[in-house]
């Protein structure tokens, strides 16, 4: 069962103001407190595809009259609500509107909210890293950070060498970013062996296919060789760019001297 909000109809809002002035004949013999609270509460219930509308009137935290679409009329909950129920039920046109509220209010607003939520979709961004320097044969924590996604329902799984991991996994609940998007952290306790490939597998309604991000276990020496190779490549590209710039300037200088 889910409960859906329903906007207050104009006539109900006007009636709310009217009800705040309590009928003296109803509360005769009682002293109206200096400060009191009146509340009109509207609910939509959806159960197995069927909508039900409930409207409650509450005075100082005590419900005194109620409309339930399953009943079709207002019913007093306390003695205070008897005259209000009689008055509400005498308003035939307004009563018919209440009886139709499961379709005209609940169903309409639910379908509208669903369309709006489906139009707000953001694909997740996924980043995988160890909590500390990845050393082979040492216990570590692998972190899969999934950010900037909407809606908030998401599935994140861990795989090691194409086999799903089911133990040593911890996850946060989806965390609101302050706008309308979410983020989540899912960690995996592991002791990496040479050649191990860990994969963070993310499924989300915004994606046509899952996002998979890999992290490969490697020794410090292999990592250093990789970094050295990358550094050498970057340095070579820098020298190449400088050489090209000097060559172009030299050509321009030769043309200018002619």
UniProtKB/Swiss-Prot annotation:
Q: Which organism is it from?
A: Spalax ehrenbergi (Middle East blind mole rat)
Please give the positions of the paired cysteines in each disulfide bond.
Answer: 44-106, 144-200
Q: What name does the UniProt record give this protein?
A: SMH class II histocompatibility antigen, beta-1 chain
* UniProt region (Connecting peptide), positions on chain: 216-225
* UniProt topological domain (Cytoplasmic) ranges: 247-258
- Domain (Ig-like C1-type): give its ranges: 124-212
**Keywords associated with the record:** Adaptive immunity, Disulfide bond, Glycoprotein, Immunity, Membrane, MHC II, Signal, Transmembrane, Transmembrane helix
GO aspect biological process, one term: antigen processing and presentation of peptide or polysaccharide antigen via MHC class II
Q: Provide the transmembrane region boundaries.
A: 226-246
Instruction: List the stretches on the Extracellular face of the membrane.
Output: 30-225
The record's annotation in InterPro entries points to: Ig-like_dom (IPR007110), Ig-like_dom_sf (IPR036179), Ig-like_fold (IPR013783), Ig/MHC_CS (IPR003006), Ig_C1-set (IPR003597), MHC/Immunoglobulin (IPR050160), MHC_I/II-like_Ag-recog (IPR011162), MHC_II_a/b_N (IPR014745)
Q: Where is this region: Beta-1?
A: 30-121
Q: Where is the signal peptide?
A: 1-29
Q: Give positions of region: Beta-2.
A: 122-215
The cellular component terms of Gene Ontology attached to this UniProt record, alphabetical and capped at eight, are: MHC class II protein complex
Q: How does it sit in the membrane?
A: Single-pass type I membrane protein
């Amino acid at each position: 069962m889910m409960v859906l909000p329903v906007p207050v109809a104009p006539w109900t809002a006007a009636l709310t103001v009217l009800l705040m002035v309590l009928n003296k004949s109803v509360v005769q013999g009682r002293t109206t407190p200096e400060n009191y609270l009146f509340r009109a509460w509207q609910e939509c219930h959806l159960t197995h595809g069927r909508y039900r509308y409930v409207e409650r009137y509450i005075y100082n935290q005590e419900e005194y009259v109620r409309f339930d679409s399953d009943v079709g009329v207002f019913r007093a909950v306390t003695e205070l609500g008897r005259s209000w129920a009689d008055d509400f039920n005498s308003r035939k046109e307004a009563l018919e509107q209440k009886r139709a509220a499961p379709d005209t209010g609940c169903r309409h607003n639910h379908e509208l909210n669903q369309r709006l939520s489906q139009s707000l979709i953001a694909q997740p961004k996924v980043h995988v890293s160890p909590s500390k320097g990845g050393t082979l044969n040492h216990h570590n924590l692998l972190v899969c950070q999934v950010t900037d996604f909407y809606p908030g329902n998401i599935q994140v799984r861990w795989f090691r060498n194409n086999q799903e991991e089911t133990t040593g996994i911890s996850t946060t609940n989806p965390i609101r970013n302050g706008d309308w998007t979410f983020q989540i952290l899912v960690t995996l306790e592991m002791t990496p062996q040479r050649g191990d490939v860990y994969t963070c597998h993310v499924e989300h309604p915004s994606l046509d296919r899952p996002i998979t991000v890999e992290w490969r276990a490697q020794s410090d020496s292999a990592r250093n060789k990789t970094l050295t190779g990358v550094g050498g490549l970057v340095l070579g590209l820098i020298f190449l760019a400088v050489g090209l710039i000097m060559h172009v300037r030299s050509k321009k200088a030769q043309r200018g001297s002619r």
